[in-house]
């Protein structure tokens, strides 16, 4: 729906900070209700990210495949009658079973190959993030225009929640359909967060607490569906880049030591709180999930299938995601962008042609964004670092859950407690890192580097088990289940800091007026890289039969972004972004002038 601007006599109009930049722009001051609408979606989807993707989905996929799999050497079923791990009554519930076949791989046949059941989960998530990257590229750039921002957010939220709920119908014989649901759910999750991120600069820009310069805003104009500008789209005047360093440049490695801008401070505060609230919701649902698992273990349900209790948990997660998405639907304003012309001058365009044109526009818009980004050194360096860092984060998360389940032989209940530990730590980290950063005067990139250094502890500690003396002891190096819990605290604290700081730090470098397009590039970089790590670890598992071998890949991967983050200069990046906006504006003005002169020449010749 189209959101009408406030009437001139309304209280909201009196608080309006700036005039609209294009016809139909909603410049209503951001309200607390609207911010809570933004928070609500994080509360909704973070539950699926943590409880689903982060813990129970990998376990469910692995267990579904395991119940159809056989041991590689003996060819006996991994679960069920005749299995070495089967209990006296012929069943082996997933939440209670500890495999006795210590030195044999459980494999499942797929496409003519025997795949380790743990690798099956890793490969599924690699495919999921690949599809996710293609999807968000195709749709998220459209969020800058009309009401697409909110429409896409709700569509991804409702479809994603449905996939989680549908898991209750996935039995072991159709475990491949479970992989399909994972691909759809993960795709919707990541794509929706991209659109959610694009709301953040808009909410900050319209917040009453942000003081605006007393100058007229540049008008934003429509863009044609073929990706060409009808008129320059820019929100900053030329004086922005000529006025010297931007005050927001507190987070770089340059010489600036000035305070952060009000916009960056507010953006970081909202972002950090959003991450923290999401973690709070995830902890609550995780506790409910463990309670549900424990209750079902006392019934005959777990004897029907070892995955059935897990599938009930995913049903609960899907219901939660759907419910809070409804809150976002009610409270978050659409904040429409400039119009995107889809009509043909010859008449009504067929619907499928309109969508093809829009998807083509999205890819063309991304390509234009890439061409702009490669001219912005600080953006390019940060994206290179983010490519490596996001791959490391995704790989560690997936590997840790499967490591706990297959190497440490932890029950599903203990894995759930492990996830709660990491989530609580992540919640603390989201609120703690801004305090630490202010207390010690750390710039944003220095805070990110500190998080990365702590993150490196995880794979290094896991590799200690290869040292003969520790291996002989049977402890140290993640050889005992209790050892993984302190590392879960480290993982949570680090992830909480990286999630909020990387998102807000990148927002500082974005050319004004291109928030959704650049956050699409940010997410495409994230998801594009996250295809690589899990797939490589999956191949290592297939080759060695051990999840632990993945640490040899993860350890150097985590360290590689540090020098890149160090050299990012936020002050310079902000100036480059504003200067790029000016060049684009001048280029579009020249193009429009040439088109006008050509038209006048044709008219003069009577054509």
From Swiss-Prot:
tRNA processing keyword on record: no
Membrane topology: Multi-pass membrane protein
Gene Ontology biological process: amino acid transmembrane export from vacuole; autophagy
Entry annotated with the keyword Transferase: no
Pfam families: ATG22
Biased composition (Low complexity): 247-263
Region (Disordered): 1-29, 235-263, 586-607
GO molecular function: transmembrane transporter activity
Transmembrane segments: 41-61, 119-139, 151-170, 188-208, 274-294, 307-327, 379-399, 415-435, 450-470, 485-507, 519-541, 550-570
GO cellular component assignments: vacuolar membrane
Coiled-coil portions: none
Major site of localization recorded for this protein: membrane
Subcellular locations according to the entry: Vacuole membrane
Matches recorded under InterPro entries: Atg22, Atg22-like, ATG22/LtaA_families, MFS_dom, MFS_trans_sf
Residues the record marks as carrying a glycan: 89, 445
UniProt KW keywords: Amino-acid transport, Autophagy, Glycoprotein, Membrane, Transmembrane, Transmembrane helix, Transport, Vacuole
Known function: Vacuolar effluxer which mediate the efflux of amino acids resulting from autophagic degradation. The release of autophagic amino acids allows the maintenance of protein synthesis and viability during nitrogen starvation.
Similarity-based family: Belongs to the ATG22 family.
Descriptive protein name: Autophagy-related protein 22-2
Gene: atg22-2
């Amino acid at each position: 729906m189209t959101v009408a601007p406030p009437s001139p006599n309304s209280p909201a109009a009196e608080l309006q900070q700036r005039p609209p930049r294009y016809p139909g722009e909603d410049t209503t001051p951001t309200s607390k209700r609207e911010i809570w609408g933004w928070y609500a979606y994080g509360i909704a989807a973070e539950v699926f990210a943590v409880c689903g993707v982060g813990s129970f989905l990998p376990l469910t996929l692995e267990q579904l495949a395991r119940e159809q799999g056989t041991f590689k050497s003996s060819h006996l079923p991994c679960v069920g009658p005749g299995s070495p791990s089967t209990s006296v009554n012929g069943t082996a519930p997933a939440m209670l079973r500890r495999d006795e076949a210590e030195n044999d791989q459980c494999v499942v046949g797929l496409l003519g190959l025997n795949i380790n059941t743990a690798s099956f989960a890793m490969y599924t998530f690699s495919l999921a993030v690949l599809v996710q990257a293609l999807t968000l590229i195709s749709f998220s750039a459209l969020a800058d225009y009309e009401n697409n921002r909110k429409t896409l957010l709700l569509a991804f939220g409702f479809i994603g929640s449905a996939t989680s709920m549908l898991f209750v119908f996935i039995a072991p014989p159709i475990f491949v359909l479970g992989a399909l649901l994972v691909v759809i759910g993960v795709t919707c999750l990541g794509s929706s967060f991209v659109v959610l991120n694009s709301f953040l600069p808009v909410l900050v820009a319209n917040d009453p607490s942000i003081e605006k310069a007393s100058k007229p805003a540049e008008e934003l104009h429509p863009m044609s569906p073929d990706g060409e500008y009808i008129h320059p789209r820019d929100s900053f005047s030329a004086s922005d880049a000529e006025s010297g360093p931007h005050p927001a440049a507190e987070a770089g490695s340059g010489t600036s030591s000035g305070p952060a801008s009000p916009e960056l401070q507010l953006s970081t505060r909202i972002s950090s709180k959003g991450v923290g609230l999401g973690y709070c919701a995830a902890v609550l649902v995780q506790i409910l999930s463990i309670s549900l698992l424990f209750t079902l273990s006392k019934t005959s349900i777990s004897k029907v299938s070892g995955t059935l209790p897990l599938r009930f948990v995913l049903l609960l997660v899907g219901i939660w995601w759907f419910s809070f998405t409804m809150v976002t639907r009610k409270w978050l304003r659409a904040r429409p962008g400039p119009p995107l012309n889809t009509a043909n001058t010859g008449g009504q365009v067929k619907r499928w042609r309109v969508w093809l044109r829009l998807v083509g526009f999205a890819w063309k818009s991304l390509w234009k964004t890439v061409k702009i980004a490669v001219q912005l050194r600080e953006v390019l360096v940060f994206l290179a670092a983010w490519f490596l860092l996001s791959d490391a984060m995704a790989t560690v998360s997936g590997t840790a859950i499967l490591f706990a389940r297959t190497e440490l032989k932890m029950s599903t209940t203990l894995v759930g407690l492990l996830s709660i530990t990491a989530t609580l730590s992540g919640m603390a980290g989201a609120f703690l890192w801004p305090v630490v950063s202010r207390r010690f005067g750390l710039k944003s990139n220095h805070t990110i580097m500190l998080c990365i250094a702590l993150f490196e502890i995880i794979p290094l500690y896991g590799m200690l088990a290869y040292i003969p003396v520790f291996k002989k002891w049977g402890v140290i190096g993640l050889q005992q289940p209790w050892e993984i819990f302190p590392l879960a605290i480290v993982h949570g604290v680090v992830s909480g800091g990286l999630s909020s700081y990387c998102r807000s730090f990148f927002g500082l470098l974005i050319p004004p007026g291109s928030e959704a397009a650049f956050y699409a590039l940010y997410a495409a970089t994230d998801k594009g890289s996250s295809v690589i790590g899990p797939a490589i670890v999956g191949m290592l598992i297939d080759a060695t039969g051990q999840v632990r071998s993945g640490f040899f890949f993860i350890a150097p991967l985590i360290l590689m972004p540090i020098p890149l983050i160090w050299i990012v200069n936020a002050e310079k990046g902000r100036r480059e972004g504003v200067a790029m906006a000016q060049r684009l504006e001048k280029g579009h003005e020249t193009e429009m002038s040439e088109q006008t002169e050509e038209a006048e020449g044709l008219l003069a010749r009577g054509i």
